Amino acid sequence: MAVFLVLVAATTSRGETGGASVPAPAPATAVKAQLGERQLAEGSEGPDVRTLQSILEARDYGPLEVNGSFDAATAAAVRRFQREAGLQADGVVGPQTRPALLALMRVKKATWYGPGLYGNRMACGGRLRRSTLGVAHRTLPCGTQVTFYHGGRFVTVPVIDRGPFRRGVEWDLTAATARALGMAATSRLRAIH
């Protein structure tokens, strides 16, 4: 059974990876609204709009405020994307626009970690707990927000640690992040960052 995740990363303005200037991780959020469950247009609000804005911002269709409110700037970014994708540029995310957005994403492998490591210090500060939502990456700055999608669930988490250290694996999710996504094993994921 193939498992796909959607990932979006937007770097922080203070993205140092070490020393005293490591940014505090933003709160992680688990969202059960799937991008594409409804048509999105100016005036729409919610976590699916936030995910749309994250995807557009990550691919330089912004600048956008990623706030979950489909405003004029979001509509303009959607129209720019639609024009480049050869779609009708109406600023509405519906059945034609959604698959084109998903086509932007590359497939990467993800694992998860946690049991046996709880209580250990993480590279970006703090200690790993059973409830810690986050992701390890080899090079993204600490605090970078990453949005994952799997099985109808979105989870936005910060980069909190370094890794993975297995060949061919791009992302190492904490066990809590994997649970929030319903991910039980090493999986191939779709990524955008």
What function would you assign to each model-found segment?
Residues 19-23, 36, 40-41, 47, ...:
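Intrinsically disordered, low-complexity, compositionally biased regions/tails
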Residues 7-34:
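C-terminal region of N-terminal signal peptides and the immediate post-cleavage residues
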Residues 28-35, 56-57, 61, 157:
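Generic signal for short, ordered secondary-structure residues
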Residues 19-24, 85-90, 115-124, 175:
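Charged, low-complexity, helix/coiled-coil-prone segments
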Residues 1-2, 16:
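N-terminal export and membrane-targeting signals
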Residues 34, 48, 99-193:
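Secreted/periplasmic proteins
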Residues 39-50, 54-99:
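Short acidic, glycine/serine/threonine-rich helix-capping segments at coil-helix boundaries
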Residues 3, 33, 37-38:
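Primarily auto-inhibitory N-terminal propeptides
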